Amino acid sequence: MDVTRLLLATLLVFLCFFTAYSHPPPEEKLRDDRSLRSNSSVNLLDFPSVSIVALNKNSKQISRKEAEKKRSSKKEASMKKVARPRTPLSAPCVATRDSCKSPAPACCDPCASCQCRFFRSACSCRVLSLNC
């Protein structure tokens, strides 16, 4: 029983100590700007001044129009990449994700290549780039 009581008393003292020192100290109340300047560790003159500029409706509309133009140009560029003609397929070829060991013919997909793993024991046709 004495060991249990000693353990509980130690735990209680530790919790009181932890509770007392975990709270931040109360802040000093500053009376005026002079005490603020003398007590502050950061000098306010070190930071550049901030200027606030009001935006009018025209500037907002221009920025929206520019954003829409950028979006449409990106879509057109991606469409141009997709619309590229592909080479005609040869009859004896290996489908994507099928085995393509050295006696096998080339991959059917022009964007795919034969990729081997485990010291060339397991080979398969895989598409490496999506933008092909």
Swiss-Prot record:
SUPFAM superfamilies: Agouti-related protein. One of its GO terms (biological process) is melanin biosynthetic process. Disulfide bonds join 93-108, 100-114, 107-125, 111-132, 116-123. InterPro entries: Agouti, Agouti_dom, Agouti_dom_sf. It is found in: Secreted. Glycans are attached at residue 39. Residues 61-87 are annotated as: Disordered. One of its GO terms (cellular component) is extracellular space. Involved in the regulation of melanogenesis. The binding of ASP to MC1R precludes alpha-MSH initiated signaling and thus blocks production of cAMP, leading to a down-regulation of eumelanogenesis (brown/black pigment) and thus increasing synthesis of pheomelanin (yellow/red pigment). This is Agouti-signaling protein. It comes from Macaca nigra.
